[in-house]
Amino acid sequence: MPKLRFTRWASILLLLLAAEGLRAAPPEDYRFLSLTEAAEQAGEAGKPMLLYFGRYGCTTCRKMHAEVFTDPGLRERLNRDFVLAYVDTESGNRIRLANGERTTEMQYATRNRIFGTPTFVFFSPQQKPLFKKAGFQSIEQMKQYAEYIVEGHYEGMPLADFLSKQ
C-alpha cells in the first residue's frame, strides 16, 4: 500500500510540474517584466513601453519567437530603448494598475479589447498608448515601429505616413 501512495503522489507532482510548463511566456533573451513593474520602470526612466499580449498555445506567438524575436538587432533595440511588459491573456495572475486598481491579466486584456494574440501595444515615454498591432509582425515592421517611437516621429506624423516613407 505505501508504494501505491508514493506512486499517486509522484504522479500528482509530475502533473503539477507539467502544468507549470504550460504557462505562456515571452521570448527568451528579452527583459520582459510584469505590467506593474514595467509601468513603474518606464515612468521612472522616461522610456517608451512595449506591451506584448500573448498566451499559451498561440502558434503565431511561437512563430514570432522563432522568426522575429531571434533577430539580434531587434533584441538589442528593444532591450535598450524600451521597457518591455508581457501579459498572458489567459492568466489569472493578479496585477496592480497605475491607478492602484487590482485585476487579473486576463481581465486587463479583455478590458483593452485584446481578442487575438500576439498583440503589441506601443506607448510613448509619457505612457500614452500610441498604437496597437495584432498578429504576426515581421522583423522589419518591429524595427520600424521602434524607430518611429524612439526617434520621436510619433509627435508630428501618423504611423501610416511614417511607414509609407520607409
What are these regions (language model features)?
Residues 1-11:
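Bacterial N-terminal signal peptides that target proteins for export
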Residues 20-25:
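Sec/Tat signal peptide C-region and signal peptidase I cleavage site
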Residues 31-49, 78:
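A short beta-strand-turn-helix
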Residues 45-59, 84:
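Short active-site neighborhood of thiol/selenol oxidoreductases, capturing the structured segment around
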Residues 62-79:
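Typically the conserved alpha-helix immediately C-terminal to a functionally engaged Cys/Sec
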Residues 107-111, 116-133:
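A short, hydrophobic beta-strand/beta-hairpin element that forms part of a small beta-sheet core
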Residues 136-166:
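Thiol-/selenol-based redox modules, centered on thioredoxin-like
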